[in-house]
Amino acid sequence: VSVDDLEFVKTHQPIRSEEGLATWYTAAKGRKSANGQVFSDHSLTAAHRTLPMGSLIVVTNLTSGQSAAMRITDRGPFVGDKLLDLTIASAKATGVYRVGTARVRLDVYRTPKPIDSGGRWCVQVGAFTSHHKAEKLKEQLLHKYPGANVIEFPGDDSFWVRIRPEGDNREKAELIARRLRPAEGEAFLTRLD
């Protein structure tokens, strides 16, 4: 987070807010975050299931009032109904580190691209090298999301399982992504157009 980012936060209103649970995580040395950068416990960054990579956010611990600006650089959390995974530095800055989990408000101040509610969206929940495993997840999801169209995309070496919400609507896709359990796949939004 740069000095310019901190100045931007001071002089602008958030474009979107969410409340939920945050926890912290760490990763093996050398592991890359979803944005392609090497993960660092010392960076003020976080993981979110659907916000665009590079989004500038402020996380406020609703119990302690501590807050910090950070960037979205990774995908997650994929455990339970948590909203954010924080690096150790972010967790310490917001008072989440010692307690492990805390209720937070996430304020989005800037995204690399506007959060576009238009267009056609779906939720990708799995990528497999095995067609059988992709079919198994597809069948499991069809039982829970009968109104959604679950499709497979054969790639060079994988099959992708996606849930298409009614009308390919972004808000409906975000709702599905937030409700998916970890056993149902690691959900993230992707555009169809």
Language-model segments: residues:
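Extracytoplasmic
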Residues: T129-D193
